[in-house]
């Protein structure tokens, strides 16, 4: 195996880590970035954005990257559904995005609490550093930009309040879909 890896110039990180992509917008939104980074840290992955292709990439061990992608898709669809249910159509896009950002902030807090309760939490920091180093080797230097989000009090606080109602214990079944539990 070592000879084949040397012959084809493959590193061990390329064999251990995989990436999962999610279709995203080319324009960066604060709530999606916050949600992706939080979910990625829970599943020991690195969340990257490919602006040219409009993709969100979760990079880590194959199962962890898959779980991060699925959780991100579930939570982002849930947030969009909550916006349609709870916010009137005539409200502005800024108001809706602040509501989404409020939900994402509350979910980030809840996911961080959930991450502290897992049995492998002490080892997570070392794994995150290894994944980050492998992602930099794979994709190049990773730049993090500051997201500007002016808070509109009413929309943000409504989002934070409604973010507590989102279920984080969704279970996949063998049937044609998912059950919320």
Residues covered by each model-derived region:
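Basic, Lys/Arg-rich alpha-helical nucleic-acid-recognition elements, primarily the DNA-binding modules
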Residues: 1-2
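Extended, helix-rich structural scaffolds rather than catalytic motifs
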Residues: 5-181
């Amino acid at each position: 195996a070592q000879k084949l890896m040397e012959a084809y110039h493959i590193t061990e990180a390329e064999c251990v880590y995989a990436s999962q992509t999610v279709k995203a917008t080319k324009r960066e939104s604060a709530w999606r970035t916050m949600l992706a980074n939080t979910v990625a840290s829970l599943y020991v992955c690195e969340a990257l954005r490919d602006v040219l292709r409009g993709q969100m990439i979760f990079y880590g061990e194959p199962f962890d990257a898959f779980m991060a992608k699925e959780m991100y898709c579930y939570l982002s669809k849930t947030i969009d559904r909550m916006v349609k249910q709870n916010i009137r159509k005539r409200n502005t896009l800024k108001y809706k995005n602040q509501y989404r950002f409020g939900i994402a902030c509350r979910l980030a807090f809840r996911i961080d609490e959930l991450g502290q309760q897992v049995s492998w939490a002490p080892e997570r920091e070392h794994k995150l550093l290894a994944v980050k180093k492998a992602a930099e080797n794979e994709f190049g230097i990773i730049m993090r930009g500051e997201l500007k989000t002016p808070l509109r009090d009413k929309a943000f606080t409504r989002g934070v309040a409604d973010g507590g109602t989102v279920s984080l214990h969704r279970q996949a079944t063998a049937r044609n879909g998912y059950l919320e539990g």
